[in-house]
Amino acid sequence: MPLNVFLSGEIHTDWRDQIVAGAKGMDVTFSAPVTNHAASDDCGVAILGAEDDKFWHDRKGAFVNAIRTRKGSEDAVVRFGDKYKQWNAAFDAGLAYGLGKSLIILQPPEHDHALKDVDAAALAVAREPGQVVDILRYVLDGTLPS
């Protein structure tokens, strides 16, 4: 049973690389949003044309980025990091939940209260990327961590 996992959320740490490396050899395909801030912010106007109003500039980018998110969201891991308010991550978690997708949240304990409703929608809340890898391994072949 292959897994297609969308790795959404903060872009300031190497959590994605840790999960991909830990899952090497597993039947998992990973995808993610575009993590280049400039490309993600400007993709809409670069492709569809300039906008005078920043609201519409951002809106075009959000729509184009949403295509990638919707196509990639089979099973989702959403990471909430220590820095910045990650509204996009919260939206991606809600989208995955709304689409009935399996959702794993990766967050530090200090976010527990703020994310209690998001966590309630998740099938698992992990603290470390290695725990996500362990969940994926268990789902694929029933193997528990040693």
Residue ranges and their predicted role:
Residues 1-146:
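Conserved catalytic or regulatory cores that recognize and/or transform ribose-phosphate-containing ligands
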